[in-house]
Amino acid sequence: MQFARQILFVVLALSVSAVQQAQAAAEADKVAVTTMIDRYCNAWSEPDAARRQQLLDQVWAEDGTYTDPLSNVAGRSNLSALIGGFLQQYPGSRIVLASAVDLHHERVRFAWKWVLADGSTTMEGMDFGELASDGRLRKIVGFFGPGVPLP
């Protein structure tokens, strides 16, 4: 009986340790993904095409797709061009993270704000995304404004 208790104790201790390790790994993943989303927002705020491309190279899969109510592009270079056009229309504006990054099963969601050069917020929205096998963004689907209320 004593031996069975010892075995049970060891199994429970190993199970608790495995859960703690999994939680620590999930938290590390969340920190890494949050850092990546910050860089993605920085790319949306970077007027210099070369620096913007460097940021996108770090966070965006080569064949990644971006879709919002006004745009649908595939590939890093096309996303960079879309951002460049946005920044030409609204110089000095930036996109900032407005929520914690929610992450599960290689899916992300986060809220953002579009801040004009004068510091005023002109729009808020939410993006939903998928991560590629290498951890970079493979897909973003963006929505503008708050959710639509029920009739």
Segments the model singles out, each with a brief description of its role:
Residues M1-R5:
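Positively charged n-region of N-terminal signal peptides that target proteins for export
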Residues I7-S17:
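Bacterial N-terminal signal peptides
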Residues A22-A26:
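Boundary at the C-terminal end of the N-terminal hydrophobic targeting segment
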Residues K30-V59:
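Short acidic-aromatic low-complexity motifs
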Residues R51-E106:
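A solvent-exposed, acidic/Ser-Thr-rich amphipathic alpha-helical stretch
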Residues I95-V96, R109, T121-D127:
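Short, surface-exposed coil-to-beta transition loops
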Residues F110-A117:
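Short beta-strand segments that buttress and anchor functional surface loops
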Residues E124-P151:
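Short beta-strand edge/turn micro-motifs at domain boundaries
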